[in-house]
Amino acid sequence: MERWLQEVPLPTAIFAAAYEMALVTLKALQRQGIAVPEQVSLVSFDDPTSAAFLDPPLTTVRQPLEALGQRAVQKLYDALQKGVMPEGTELLPPELIVRDSTAPPRAEGTKPSPIAKGGASP
């Protein structure tokens, strides 16, 4: 992650597909002296309780796990008891939990990383 941050233009935001990846990304950004969210916003998929206690608290996309479990059990019950096989796809909307790791994008969104070789300073 740190090497990637040095080699690419600094993005305005990073979306981590897993919470663990968000933790690695946050630590790499902090080690490189890149301020979250002032320079880069960070968002993660999944919303464990600990996300609210990071520095800064992490913006996340929460899956409706309880509702997903209820629907799965209902579909399994219907299949076993009623002989009704589920058809199609059912989508349950996620919820955006906005915390302090996100901000509006900075004006110079394409500015090179301040730590990249030959890059401009912030």
Could you tell me what each predicted segment is?
Residues 2-111, 117:
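Flexible loop/turn connectors
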Residues 120-121:
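Short, intrinsically disordered C-terminal tails of secreted or membrane-associated proteins
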